């Protein structure tokens, strides 16, 4: 069986992932890491400063990390040095952090993505196809999340923008509009924060007399956890390198 440890194991997402791990016959949950000691499903959770020793003790094959950028920067480097495969769902990295992290983890197999939902990964491919055919349309990206989400725009929205610009070329990202504005070579980006919205993402393609709109809505965080479980079962068999869910799903 594939031994799994979880960073942020005492949090809502970490606990959900742990419960899904024990339901998967390929995986074994052996413990976790958080800001304090504890237990999850009868397995030990240690503070992050003890991660290296904990890895030596329980010998995990995979570490799943859905925490915050600062914590992931530390934990992923430690795990990679120990030869542990990684599944990283943390978002909010600065470009400098992202480059540093990718360099530090390149010698182990890693699945790193801004969204583990199977539906979102299909959605990205639909957006790519539409953008490749509708390059002369005006494009707007709208995303909504719960009031507590820290990063804006979301990592998923940033991936949407990356996908679009790979197809239509570089455009200015226009975050909201105010006053007298003139349409230029841009993509409008609109961020909504409120209530308990799990995650809504919409891409609109506008042309005279018609609009095409693609939308993905997540109704439960379980969709992200399920994707992470698929990645955890896949990644130990992969060669060293950084992958996305596109490889996991065979898209």
UniProtKB/Swiss-Prot annotation:
Its EC number is 1.17.1.8. The keyword NADP applies. One of its GO terms (biological process) is lysine biosynthetic process via diaminopimelate. This is 4-hydroxy-tetrahydrodipicolinate reductase. PANTHER family: 4-HYDROXY-TETRAHYDRODIPICOLINATE REDUCTASE 1, CHLOROPLASTIC-RELATED (PTHR20836:SF0), DIHYDRODIPICOLINATE REDUCTASE (PTHR20836). It is an enzyme of class 1 (oxidoreductase). The active site is at residues 145, 149. The keyword Iron-sulfur does not apply. Signal peptide: none annotated. The gene is dapB. (S)-2,3,4,5-tetrahydrodipicolinate binds at residues 146, 155-156. Pathway: Amino-acid biosynthesis; L-lysine biosynthesis via DAP pathway; (S)-tetrahydrodipicolinate from L-aspartate: step 4/4. Belongs to the DapB family. GO terms for cellular component: cytoplasm. Catalyzes the conversion of 4-hydroxy-tetrahydrodipicolinate (HTPA) to tetrahydrodipicolinate. It is found in: Cytoplasm. Keywords: Amino-acid biosynthesis, Cytoplasm, Diaminopimelate biosynthesis, Lysine biosynthesis, NAD, NADP, Oxidoreductase.
